[in-house]
Curated annotation (Swiss-Prot):
This is Guanylate kinase. Belongs to the guanylate kinase family. The gene is gmk. Keywords: ATP-binding, Cytoplasm, Kinase, Nucleotide-binding, Transferase. One of its GO terms (cellular component) is cytosol. It comes from the Bacteria. It catalyses: GMP + ATP = GDP + ADP. It comes from Shewanella oneidensis (strain ATCC 700550 / JCM 31522 / CIP 106686 / LMG 19005 / NCIMB 14063 / MR-1). It is found in: Cytoplasm. Essential for recycling GMP and indirectly, cGMP. PANTHER family: GUANYLATE KINASE, GUANYLATE KINASE-RELATED. InterPro entries: GK/Ca_channel_bsu, Guanylate_kin-like_dom, Guanylate_kinase, Guanylate_kinase_CS, P-loop_NTPase. GO terms for molecular function: ATP binding; guanylate kinase activity. Its EC number is 2.7.4.8. Residues 5-184 form the Guanylate kinase-like domain.
Amino acid sequence: MTARGNLFIVSAPSGAGKSSLISALLKDKPADMQVSVSHTTRAPRPGEINGQHYHFVNVEEFKALIAQNAFFEWAEVFGNYYGTSRHVIEHTLTQGIDVFLDIDWQGAQQVKAVMPEAIGVFILPPSRDELERRLTGRGQDSKDVIDSRMAQAVSEMSHYKEYDFIIVNDDFDTALADLRAIIRSQRLTGASQIHAQNDMLNDLLAG
């Protein structure tokens, strides 16, 4: 019997390494894990593929999905809408596949309200100085933009207590191992094992 997959909410301030950790976790395309593909109204960027990076829809289509209660969570960011499909998540979880939501604390609160069993993981940088170094090191933004992102990062980090697990991304390999350990631990809970090993348990306890 296939155990239901777990829903992991992964949040972090910009520069904490969240996207890199998720990419490393899934680089070998494991059959039992996948990242949720969000819907968005923004235009595709060069190289982005519809259905792989995002589900690209227009504003009218997105608002129709909101009216249908089709999203676990949705938000408007810089004039564009983003949302997580309720149907896709539920279907994937019933197949025994763990799903990762790469969303902020506001989205996490929305998901937790409808699926309290979702597992929250917050990624932190080892220090404020290191976070600023990472943001500056990208070499793509002005000081004003970096200052704005730092302020936004501090605001985001203030919600770390709302999550079930906290990973400090000081050493990348250690942080990745920590993330894998969290996933493994959730697959070994009593509820998960009872479901996954139902036939074996019945056989062991047969009179």
